[in-house]
Every structure is written in structure tokens, then in C-alpha cells.
Amino acid sequence: MRNLICICGEIMNIIDEIRNYEPFNAQEAKDKELIVSCLRNMEHVFSRDNKIAHMTASAWVVNQRRDKVLMAYHKIYDSWAWLGGHADGEFDLLKVALRETTEESGIKNIHPVSENIYSLEVLSVGGHVKHGTYVSSHLHLNVTYLLEAEEHESLSIKLDENSNVSWFSPEETIRASSEQWFKENIYNKLTVS
């Protein structure tokens, strides 16, 4: 019973954090409603056990001068993209964004510019094969955090997910991505936020 109370408390904290987030645009306002609804009404939202929708956290990683953004070339999407990944049972989504950034880029000296959510979005993921197993189409209920890293720290590639990691100017992030929806609705938004 104590674990259930703890989990409910963690979910309520995240719902409050998302409810307090001021949407940047209409996409974020609608996605905010959907994320809160899923958190309130669906089970296992912090686990991939929920095959319909689950929580993820992304990182918009900038250098200290704020003139470069760190991106990885994701094999599944065949595109340059921000860093991030699944909550996988972790309720601290900032911790997820930090963990995924380190895993995908090798950068260890990284910190949040703010502990508040930087953006949020519901991302549709098309069906794909991962580690030899088919994964059906589903939704990522995503929150993004603004992180800062040292641009000159050595980068490393997470070979099972990425084929490259590199710094780009904010404008180059939009051109580098081959995912039109991401370019128009996410990277465009993040470069001006």
C-alpha cells in the first residue's frame, strides 16, 4: 500500500508540474491536455508496458554560449534529432533527460539550465523493429528540459541507437533533421524559446 501511495504522489507531482507549465503555442496547449489525461486515466504510463502511450523525456542541450545544440543521428528515424528516451519506471523526468543525454552522447559534465519543463509534446512513433522485435505504433508523452554542456567535452556514439553525435547551430538543427513535423513543430519552437 505504501508503494502505491508513493507512486500516486509521484504522478500527482508530475501532473502538477505539467499543469503549471505555460504552453508556448496551440500544439503545446493541446498536448498538455492529452498528457495530463493519460497520466490520470491510463496505467503504466511510465513504462513501455503501456503499448499505447508512455512517458519520455528529451533534452535540448546547448553549449555555454548558447550558440550550439547537441544532436544525435538516430538510426530508427534515419535523422538528426535531439537526445532523450523512455522513462522506464523513473518518475523524475529531468533525471531521465540527463541520463539519456549521457548515454547517447558520452557527455558527463551536463546540468539543467532550469529544472522546469522547457517544452512538451505528444510524439507519434511509427511501427518499427528494435533489437529484432517489431514495436507497434504508439505515442510518446514527452517533456523536454533545457540542459547545458561543455562543447569541447569528448563525444561518443551509442552504437545500438545512433550513428553520430555532433554540435549544430540552432538554425542547422532545423536543416539537419529529415523529419518534417519535428522541424516545423519542435526544433523551430525550441530555437526561439
Annotate each predicted stretch with a short phrase.
Residues 20-58:
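Acidic, metal-coordinating catalytic segment for phosphate/diphosphate chemistry
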Residues 178-193:
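Charged phosphate-binding loop/patch that engages nucleotide di/tri-phosphates or the phosphate backbone
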Residues 81, 87-88:
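Short, flexible micro-motifs
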Residues 2-11:
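Short, Lys/Arg-enriched N-terminal segments with co-localized hydrophobic residues
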Residues 11-22:
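Generic N-terminal amphipathic, Lys/Arg-enriched alpha-helix
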Residues 47-82:
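N-terminal strand-loop-strand
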Residues 88-181:
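Unchanged
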Residues 1-3, 192-193:
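Basic/polar N-terminal segments that are highly enriched at the extreme N-terminus
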